């Protein structure tokens, strides 16, 4: 199997518990790939972090870069293949460390990668994992965070956005602020209160479609 012209011979025969030599080989692969595939600068300089991404050019550039890194097996490295990953046990930490050291552009879908994906892998249904994980890794669908509120800030115990069950659906009412990546996202990690009498346990975690009617 080749990844952008670099051979990765250990991919097909990697053991479940990798040896030190396999880890070293993968680390060297990551270093070579990042060195040879470092993207050229954008015409419009990138902001310091993904919070500040506003230009369409920035989004396209960063989504293309993340997709390329995923194809090279630097993202979703240890996630099962049926969920859009590469199935290499214990290797994601190596890939992430080499990406940081290489000082290449950041991954725009950091909320999807750092919050949505880990949550789905532990708590998601099989259908949810197959539906949502692949486009998180490739940056085809960007995720934002819907936690903080105008009257509560980041104090989730004071969260007021309500969620009321209506048959098979939920009716959600409320407002969110400091919605990181909200302007460019397809989906939101949304916290809403389904039990107003239970401040600590009466909160539900929703996967909210940003294109849904009523989202403004």
Predicted regions mapped to residue ranges:
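Amphipathic, small/basic residue-rich leader segments at the start of a protein or domain
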Residues: 2-110, 131-138
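Long, well-ordered alpha-helical segments
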Residues: 30-40, 94, 124-129, 167-173, ...
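Short, solvent-exposed loop/turn elements at beta->coil junctions and helix N-caps
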Residues: 82, 148-152, 177-178
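N-terminal glycine-rich flavin-associated loop
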Residues: 108-127, 153
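A structural signal for short hydrophobic beta-strand segments in well-ordered beta-sheet cores
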Residues: 161-164
């Amino acid at each position: 199997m080749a990844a952008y012209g670099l051979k990765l011979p250990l991919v097909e025969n990697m053991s479940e518990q990798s040896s030190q030599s396999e880890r070293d080989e993968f680390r060297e692969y990551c270093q070579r790939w990042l060195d040879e595939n470092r993207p050229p600068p954008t015409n419009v300089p990138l902001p310091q972090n993904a919070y500040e991404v506003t230009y369409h050019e920035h989004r396209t550039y960063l989504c293309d870069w993340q997709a390329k890194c995923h194809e090279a097996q630097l993202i979703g490295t240890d996630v099962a293949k049926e969920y859009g990953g590469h199935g290499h046990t214990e290797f994601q930490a190596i890939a992430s460390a080499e990406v940081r050291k290489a000082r290449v552009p950041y991954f725009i879908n950091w909320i999807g990668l750092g919050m949505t994906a880990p949550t789905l892998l532990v708590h998601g249904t099989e259908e949810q994992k197959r539906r949502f994980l692949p486009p998180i890794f490739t940056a085809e669908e960007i995720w934002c965070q819907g936690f903080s509120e105008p009257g509560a800030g980041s104090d989730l115990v004071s969260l007021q956005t309500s969620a009321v069950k209506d048959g098979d659906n939920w009716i959600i009412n409320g407002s969110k602020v400091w919605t990181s990546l909200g302007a460019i996202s397809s989906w939101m990690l949304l916290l809403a209160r389904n039990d107003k009498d239970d401040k600590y346990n009466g909160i539900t975690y929703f996967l909210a479609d940003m294109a849904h009617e009523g989202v403004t």
